Curated annotation (Swiss-Prot):
Function: Catalyzes the 2-beta-hydroxylation of several biologically active gibberellins, leading to the homeostatic regulation of their endogenous level. Catabolism of gibberellins (GAs) plays a central role in plant development.
Domain Fe2OG dioxygenase: 186-306
Native source species: Oryza sativa subsp. japonica
This enzyme's EC code(s): 1.14.11.13
Lineage of the organism: Eukaryota, Viridiplantae, Streptophyta, Embryophyta, Tracheophyta
Name of the protein: Gibberellin 2-beta-dioxygenase 2
Record InterPro entries: DIOX_N, IPNS-like_FE2OG_OXY, IPNS-like_sf, Iron_ascorbate_oxido_reductase, Oxoglu/Fe-dep_dioxygenase_dom
Family statement drawn from the similarity comment of this UniProt entry: Belongs to the iron/ascorbate-dependent oxidoreductase family. GA2OX subfamily.
GO biological processes: gibberellin catabolic process; response to light stimulus
Keywords: Dioxygenase, Iron, Metal-binding, Oxidoreductase
Gene3D superfamilies: B-lactam Antibiotic, Isopenicillin N Synthase, Chain
Name of the gene this protein is made from: GA2OX2
Length: 370
């Protein structure tokens, strides 16, 4: 079910009554309750598809429970990640530098962004994982590959389930069109593992403030949106993830709300490509990670992406006389090239606003290859 909230997004006339009772973020005092979706569909698949579509339209983010990913698969991924990050720095560097794949520390991208973290980025294909595995787990690279591949397969299935539900909830003529983008054999999906050690900067702030909250939280990973189609995140029980609510972002406010950790759940958020594909109906939410002085935070994110040649353009069902095309057509490769020239916090989609003479709406690729 979706956690009730005070206000609902626009969901179409048929869904208006349901949207009024089930909105996106429930405000309780100064806190915010993240929308929760039970993926086991206790009220039926039709209601589940509407719930997922409402959550992604209103906030671009939800907590998925009863998601079907086996706990043993998640536990094995956690153990493999922890075993890597506990290694000596020189040993971890053998899996780097991040170009953009591999091991990295503090530096995020090539444009000056830094954070209080270390990370490992892998392409989500078995062959790509195998090529890096010997530098990550020299004792048993095949074991590491198997753990990552099992995890990727389970989380990819969850991502596909979400995208199929979105296709149904949005009323697409072909509800599987979004899923086919990330299941193409040459998809560009990634797996990213972030490790945030307790922050010395935050500890210094605690000391200066007499043990109270640090005046300025240490930034583990700065403000950004995810560029791909969909992100599926799981983390341990350390907090740190924060969201910038869409209404606050539109008003130019910087009101960040914390997301309570839940290691048993997955957190799903809309990426830039999905916002473009749905002509802005679904929202790519801005988020960041702050680091405290408590326990380390370990998170694993599956970034579901299409092939590099995939053509990203608003789906026909999302364009109408009252809802003109917001973004011009582009390929994922073009979007990535632009992304690599910008700082982390840049609103990348602003550079792809539609102009006169853009092509027809649709989703596909440059050479009709899937």
């Amino acid at each position: 079910m979706v956690v009730p909230a005070a206000a609902a997004p626009e969901c179409g006339r048929r869904e208006a009554a349901a949207a009024a009772a089930a909105a996106v973020f429930c405000r309780r005092g100064r806190g915010v309750v993240v929308p929760t979706v039970d993926m086991s569909a206790p009220a039926g698949r039709g209601e589940l598809s509407r719930q997922v579509a409402r959550a992604c339209a209103g906030s671009g983010f939800f907590r998925a429970v009863n998601h079907g990913v086996p706990p043993r698969v998640s536990a094995a991924m956690d153990a493999a990640a922890a075993a890597f990050f506990v290694r000596a720095g020189a040993e971890k560097q053998l899996a780097g530098p991040p170009d953009p794949l591999g091991y990295g520390s503090r530096s995020i991208g090539a444009n000056g962004d830094v954070g209080e973290l270390e990370y490992l980025i892998l392409h989500a294909s078995p062959d790509a994982v195998a090529r890096k595995a010997s530098a990550i787990d020299r004792e048993d690279p095949r074991r590491f590959s198997q753990v990552v591949n099992d995890y990727v397969e389970a989380v990819r299935q969850l991502a596909c389930h979400v995208l199929d539900l979105l296709g149904e909830g949005l009323g697409l003529r072909d509800p599987t069109s979004l899923t086919r983008l990330i299941t193409a054999t040459d998809n560009d999906s990634l797996i990213r593992i972030n490790h945030y050690p307790p922050s010395c900067a935050a500890a210094a702030g605690d000391h200066k403030s007499g043990g109270g909250p640090a005046p300025t939280a240490a930034i583990g990973f700065g403000e950004h949106t995810d560029p791909q189609i969909l992100s599926v995140l799981r983390a341990n029980d350390a907090d740190g993830l924060q969201l910038l609510l869409p209404d606050a972002a539109a008003a130019g406010d910087s009101v960040w709300v914390p997301v309570p950790p839940d290691p048993s759940a997955f957190f799903v958020n809309v990426g830039d490509l999905l916002q473009a594909l749905t002509n802005g109906r679904l929202v790519s939410i801005r988020h960041r990670v702050v680091v405290g002085t408590g326990k380390p935070r370990l998170s694993t994110i599956y970034f579901a992406a299409p092939p590099l040649h995939a053509r990203i353009s608003a789906l026909p069902e999302t364009v109408a006389a009252g809802a003109p095309r917001r973004y011009r057509a582009f390929t994922w490769a073009e979007y990535k090239r632009t992304m690599y020239t910008l700082r982390l916090s840049h609103n990348r989609l602003d550079l792809f606003h539609a102009g006169d003479g853009d092509g027809d709406a649709g989703v596909g690729d440059d050479d009709d290859h899937e």
